[in-house]
């Protein structure tokens, strides 16, 4: 048998049928749905008189457009568009009999946090959702990626997806990370080096000592942003860290099934002589706390750097840099650590887990946010929120001047009430810094939770190592 990558193994195990041109019918193990990309799909089933093929493998949760302020359990307190979408998901989930976590359920939260938290995401699975950051689940050694609304309907109806296989790409982070450097810094550094198109046409497997040393929360941060690097999906091979995280979760295997599952999961790794179409290697010790300066995730530099000039680039990137600098209101040559911030957002499917909140709380404990600063912490799920309150993190944030919100996608995207105003500049733990992503003419700098917390305290982008 020829050597295989982890991606090869999962793909081959799920191919139900293959055409002569390489197009495959892929079986899907888990289908996650939310309120924004599913209404038309459910309506399509209804119009065709179809049922959900595997409701026991379909998980629904409202997250993108739900308010994160108190009173949201009352539909009359929601903005009209939020109310309509949440009500539609509620109706569809109950009518079609899928697993459902409504806003009144403490288990509700961002779908890519709820899935792993509840044990729905397991190694070796195929996972899809009508959301690009489905790649998050690849941290478990699952093949996970986003799909469009028409594909959502197809998976609901058949539990399969028509796909062509991507190429294999390996990103290895060697050695150890320096103190103060996090998973978010790793993935921003990777994208800064490879560009947002570096992974186009590939599934990326992240490996190396620095990746192995990460917790599951950190690994989810890495895979979450595989899509920002252009990849179809991101993968990290499962190991004892993975098994320990999954064990005992509500929908994880139990008893003899657990032992059998772990024995199989231990075979999910890339063989030594497997073929890679592209390899990128970065030394962990070379990675520093990282921030974005422009309007693309690839506009990432160490916090110790200065804002680049358009002349530092070539080709079409010259004009792109000029436009980004104009939009962001920055001057070439200024220190990144001199950029003043007026808003801080800690949350999202990238960095809304308990470990992220602990890291931010460690920075702000005993301190106050800068006068005039608007800062909010939005836990990724109701269970994360409850745990943070039990650990005293919520009080640390509130004492420092942060808003302590309910679970949801919040300010990651300008789809719900949590938005930037024109010209506001935000240090954000989310995943995209596009023009208008957080609000009309809002300016976004992507950072780790610790770096976001540091910015809240100092009022500017700050090297957290100095605090």
Swiss-Prot record:
Enzyme class (EC, first level): lyase
Keyword 4Fe-4S: yes
Requisite cofactors: [4Fe-4S] cluster
Top-level lineage group: Bacteria
EC code(s) of this entry: 4.2.1.33
Co-factor: note: Binds 1 [4Fe-4S] cluster per subunit.
GO biological process: L-leucine biosynthetic process
Reactions that this protein is recorded to catalyse: (2R,3S)-3-isopropylmalate = (2S)-2-isopropylmalate
Record key words, sorted: 4Fe-4S, Amino-acid biosynthesis, Branched-chain amino acid biosynthesis, Iron, Iron-sulfur, Leucine biosynthesis, Lyase, Metal-binding
GO molecular function: 3-isopropylmalate dehydratase activity; 4 iron, 4 sulfur cluster binding; metal ion binding
Database matches in Pfam families: Aconitase
Positions contributing to [4Fe-4S] cluster binding: 349, 409, 412
Pathway: Amino-acid biosynthesis; L-leucine biosynthesis; L-leucine from 3-methyl-2-oxobutanoate: step 2/4
Function according to Swiss-Prot or TrEMBL: Catalyzes the isomerization between 2-isopropylmalate and 3-isopropylmalate, via the formation of 2-isopropylmaleate.
Family, per entry: Belongs to the aconitase/IPM isomerase family. LeuC type 1 subfamily.
Subunit structure as annotated in this protein's UniProt entry: Heterodimer of LeuC and LeuD.
NCBIfam families in the record: leuC, PRK05478.1, PRK12466.1
Name of protein: 3-isopropylmalate dehydratase large subunit
Native organism: Ruegeria sp. (strain TM1040)
């Amino acid at each position: 048998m020829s050597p295989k990558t982890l991606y090869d193994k999962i793909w081959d195990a799920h191919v139900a049928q293959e055409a002569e041109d390489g197009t495959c019918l892929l079986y899907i193990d888990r289908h996650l749905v939310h309120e924004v990309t599913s209404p038309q799909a459910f309506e399509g089933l209804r119009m065709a008189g179809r049922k959900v093929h595997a409701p026991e493998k379909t998980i629904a949760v409202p997250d993108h457009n739900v308010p994160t302020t108190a009173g949201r359990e009352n539909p009359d307190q929601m903005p009209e568009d939020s109310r309509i979408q949440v009500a539609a998901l509620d109706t569809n989930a109950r009518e079609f009999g899928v697993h459902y976590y409504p806003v009144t359920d403490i288990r509700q939260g961002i779908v890519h946090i709820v899935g792993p938290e509840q044990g729905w995401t397991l190694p070796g699975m195929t996972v899809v959702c009508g959301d690009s950051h489905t790649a998050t689940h690849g941290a478990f050694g699952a093949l996970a990626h986003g799909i469009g609304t028409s594909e959502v309907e197809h998976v609901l109806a058949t539990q399969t997806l028509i796909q062509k296989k991507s190429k294999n790409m390996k990103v290895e982070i060697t050695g150890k990370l320096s103190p103060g450097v996090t998973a978010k810094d790793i993935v921003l550094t990777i994208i800064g080096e490879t560009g947002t198109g570096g992974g186009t046409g590939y599934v990326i497997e992240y490996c190396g000592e620095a990746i192995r040393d990460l917790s599951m929360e950190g690994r989810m941060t890495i895979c979450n942003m595989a899509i920002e690097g252009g990849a179809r999906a991101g993968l990290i091979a499962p190991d004892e860290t993975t098994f320990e995280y999954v064990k005992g979760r509500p929908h994880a295997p139990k008893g003899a099934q657990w032992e059998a599952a772990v024995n199989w999961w231990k075979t999910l790794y890339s063989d030594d002589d497997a073929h890679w179409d592209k390899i990128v290697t970065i030394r962990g010790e070379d990675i520093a706390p990282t921030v974005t300066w422009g309007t693309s995730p690839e506009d990432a530099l160490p916090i110790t750097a200065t804002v680049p000039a358009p002349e530092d680039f070539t080709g079409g990137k010259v004009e792109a840099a000029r436009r980004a600098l104009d939009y962001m209101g920055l001057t070439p040559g200024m220190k990144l650590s001199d950029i003043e911030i007026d808003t801080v957002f800690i949350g999202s499917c990238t960095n809304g887990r308990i470990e992220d909140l602990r890291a931010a709380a460690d920075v702000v404990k005993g301190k106050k946010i800068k006068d005039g600063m608007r800062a909010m912490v939005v836990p990724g799920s109701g269970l994360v929120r409850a745990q943070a309150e039990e650990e005293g993190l919520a009080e640390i944030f509130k004492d420092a001047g942060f808003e302590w919100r309910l679970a949801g996608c919040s300010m990651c995207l300008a789809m719900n009430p949590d938005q930037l105003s024109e010209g506001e500049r935000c240090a954000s733990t989310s995943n995209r810094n596009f023009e208008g992503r957080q609000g009309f003419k809002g300016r976004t700098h992507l950072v780790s939770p610790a770096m976001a917390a540091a910015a809240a305290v100092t009022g500017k982008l700050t090297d957290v190592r100095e605090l």
